[in-house]
């Protein structure tokens, strides 16, 4: 009898849906924690995606470890791996807040009074959440990339310098390519995460442990990150300030064409390993923190 009452209380708790403002706050906090942990890998990923093969066939970085070593040695130690973190965190707050909260919002709207949500509704919710996030966060994503790459030329650009150089209009350079990356990513990620979470949840109590949430986040992140890597490469190249010997791109299609012509199709998957290594723990940690906060809200209301 007591056990049944506890189960019913747990079910009622899990049915409590936090309001949008609460999910926005939870998403922001979760994003800051997750992003700070994996930022050095994001830095290395950007460097690897941007580097070109020289005329003699040599590369500045021979993989992830080599990039870590050279940045630490030549660019101010470990601190060099955190260049762009300030602008990244400024962008992460609205990015994760909007992406996570709006995904839950659209899921709730699609689901209505039903006890389940259809797969296409999960896919659509993720895509719409991705669109909302990109419009708000593209400027900070662009600034972060410019700051991460600036050390290559010897001069390290500051946040103020990058923003002054780009101007308001320039801060939205590459928005189309960012949408091309983030909308499919969100569609894949949230649909896989939602399905896995549902299948691993105890159907009697509605409970799911944090390790299982972490597993869902890591698995969904790995798949979504791998599939969307070509779009991430194109976005990075469009948004990075070109050097004297770098090609100039007229748009997404032109960047695809020139990249494949000069470096082959493999170039579209540059940085795929660090990208997966970033996205997997980032979204795993972020979703765990996010779900903890949602659970806390439910237990106090």
From Swiss-Prot:
Pfam families: Mito_carr
Transmembrane feature ranges: 24-44, 76-97, 123-143, 174-194, 208-228, 272-292
Keyword Protein biosynthesis: no
Coiled coil: none
Entry keywords, A to Z: Membrane, Mitochondrion, Mitochondrion inner membrane, Repeat, Transmembrane, Transmembrane helix, Transport
Family annotation (SUPFAM superfamilies): Mitochondrial carrier
Membrane topology: Multi-pass membrane protein
Disulfide links within the chain: none
An example molecular function term from Gene Ontology annotations: transmembrane transporter activity
Gene3D superfamilies: Mitochondrial carrier domain (1.50.40.10)
Positions in the Mitochondrial intermembrane compartment: 1-23, 98-122, 195-207, 293-301
Residue intervals on the Mitochondrial matrix side: 45-75, 144-173, 229-271
Segments annotated as Solcar repeats: 18-109, 117-199, 208-296
Gene Ontology CC terms: mitochondrial inner membrane
Subcellular location: Mitochondrion inner membrane
Main location group: mitochondrion
Family: Belongs to the mitochondrial carrier (TC 2.A.29) family.
Record function comment: Mitochondrial solute carriers shuttle metabolites, nucleotides, and cofactors through the mitochondrial inner membrane.
Protein name from the UniProt record: Mitochondrial substrate carrier family protein X
Organism for this UniProt entry: Dictyostelium discoideum
Gene from which this protein is expressed: mcfX
